[in-house]
Amino acid sequence: MKVLKFGAVWCNGCVVMKPRWGQLEKEFPWLQTEFYDYDRDKDMVRKYNVTDELPMVVFLDKQGNEFLRISGEISKEKIVEIILANKDK
């Protein structure tokens, strides 16, 4: 599983989510995550059809297929639930 995180410096929810993801990346070192800036990484923003509803998180399976997309702030507990339920994807 890979997690693509989209955010921007002007996004308040992105600022809130950054430390949550930092904690999760330490707790789940095997989890592959990548961050893309909404204003700078336009190719990835277009590729994944990311709107300005940030933060946006796109979950990909091992084949690179999207299986879940969430926008807005997410509790750490909910993210853990998603990770554990899909860790073998």
Language model: regions and residue ranges:
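Local sequence-structure signature of Cys/Sec-based thiol-disulfide redox active-site neighborhoods
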Residues: M1-L24
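Non-catalytic interaction surface on structured domains
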Residues: M17, F28-L31, F59
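Non-catalytic, surface beta->alpha helical segment in thiol-disulfide oxidoreductase systems
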Residues: F59-K89
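Structural micro-motif
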Residues: Y48-F59
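Thiol-based oxidoreductase modules, predominantly thioredoxin-like and allied folds used
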Residues: F6, P29-D43
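Chalcogenol-based redox active-site neighborhoods
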Residues: K47-Y48, K76
